[in-house]
């Protein structure tokens, strides 16, 4: 086991250490001045049950960052284990919704019909967090579908295998 102090000289190692934490995979969507936008995100977590709050963190360097920060509403879609290609697609292209059946929810937010869970949110607050923004959303509606989640760890997609 190695140890280091996070610094620009150790940025790659710091990122590698963060990648050891296995997460689920989400796609965040919103309406923007130029049309619907999306972004694959694994920086998603619950904040509060009462009121129902969640957060996610877009990078400042993302060309979609400013549009998401300006959005009054957004949706977070938790992907199913068979949606790896969808995760890859929206990691690279945030405006092409051709691979998915899309409906529009309140405030014209684009919604995926096929996902494990969907959280429709109003933007509650946005904080600066280093090279990312921390977007906190108040959850207005939840849609839940049974199934298994898509997982992500150390730069690779996979599946979660529960232990009995």
What are these regions (language model features)?
Residues 1-164:
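Basic, polyanion-binding surface patches
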């Amino acid at each position: 086991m190695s140890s280091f102090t996070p610094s620009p000289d150790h940025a790659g190692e710091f990122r590698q250490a963060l990648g050891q934490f296995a997460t689920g995979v989400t796609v965040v969507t919103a309406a923007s001045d130029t049309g619907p936008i999306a972004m694959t995100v694994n920086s998603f977590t619950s904040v509060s049950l009462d009121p129902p709050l969640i957060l996610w963190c877009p990078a400042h360097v993302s060309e979609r960052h400013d549009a998401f920060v300006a959005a009054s509403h957004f949706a977070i879609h938790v992907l199913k284990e068979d949606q790896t290609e969808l995760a890859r697609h929206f990691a690279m292209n945030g405006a092409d919704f051709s691979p998915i059946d899309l409906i529009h929810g309140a405030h014209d937010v684009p919604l995926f019909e096929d996902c494990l869970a969907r959280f429709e949110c109003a933007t509650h607050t946005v904080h600066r967090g280093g090279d990312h923004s921390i977007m906190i959303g108040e959850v207005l509606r939840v849609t839940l579908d049974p199934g298994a989640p898509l997982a992500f760890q150390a730069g690779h997609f996979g599946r979660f295998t529960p232990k009995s």
